Each structure stands twice: as structure tokens, then as C-alpha cells.
Amino acid sequence: MRHYEIILLIHPDQSEQVPAMLERYKGMIVAGGGQVHRVEDWGRRQLAYLINKLAKAHYLCLNIEADQAVMAELEHAFKFNDAVLRHLTVQKKKAETGASSMMKTVEREEARKASQAEFAASNER
């Protein structure tokens, strides 16, 4: 089996359906004998250019180990799901389980927003 990294751009109006989509895709991988090594929800982010007249999308990153039959099934599911705006699958040499640089950026942004909110709350007193 080979290792893959999959990036999904989901329609921003479908953000509530993301957990159900993830479970469905993870179920397809496990049912095919594969493994899910890492799942990251990067949240709603600005796009570099408009896709279907949308300026934002919900980003997901999956690191998996699967065979070609499972990958073909996943690619087919991505193509025929209207909520998936774009998908990118990259073959990797080994499984990556640590936090990606994008996830570290997301965590830094969340920490910065929390500290700003805390600072604003302390100044109101």
C-alpha cells in the first residue's frame, strides 16, 4: 500500500456537513483495508482566486495509506460530490502523523485571536 496526502476544498455553505463527509471517506478507506494516519480541519480560508464565484472554502487535509482501488473509489466520490470544489492527491514516501505547517499556522492564528479577545476583555474593566 502507498501513502497519500489529500487536500479537499469544500463549499463554504457545506461546513456543517464536513464531519459527516470525513466519516464517510474514512469509512471507505478503512473498508478497503487502508489506514487514516492524520486528519486536519484547516477551517474556512480565503481562496487565491474565485472558484465557482466563491472567495472562500473549507479546507481539509488527510494523510492515508491505501491501495489503488481505494484511491480510485475516493477520487470517484470526490468528483461526484458537488460540495467538493477541488481536490489534490499527492503520493508520499512515508506516513506523516505530525501537525502540518498549515495546521501550526491555524493554531497560531487561533491563539492570537484568543489573546486579543482576552486583552480586549481586560481593558473593558
From Swiss-Prot:
Region span, Disordered = 94-125
Instruction: Please give the organism.
Output: Acidovorax ebreus (strain TPSY)
GO CC terms for this protein? cytosolic small ribosomal subunit
Q: Which HAMAP family match?
A: Ribosomal_bS6
Protein family (similarity comment): Belongs to the bacterial ribosomal protein bS6 family.
- What Pfam families does the annotation carry? Ribosomal_S6
Q: What is this protein called?
A: Small ribosomal subunit protein bS6
The cross-references to NCBIfam families, in alphabetical order and at most eight, read:
S6
Q: Name one GO biological process term.
A: translation
The GO molecular function terms of this record are: small ribosomal subunit rRNA binding; structural constituent of ribosome
**UniProt keyword list:** Ribonucleoprotein, Ribosomal protein, RNA-binding, rRNA-binding
Q: Where is the composition biased (Basic and acidic residues)?
A: 105-115
Describe its function: Binds together with bS18 to 16S ribosomal RNA.
Question: Does the keyword field hold RNA-binding?
Answer: yes
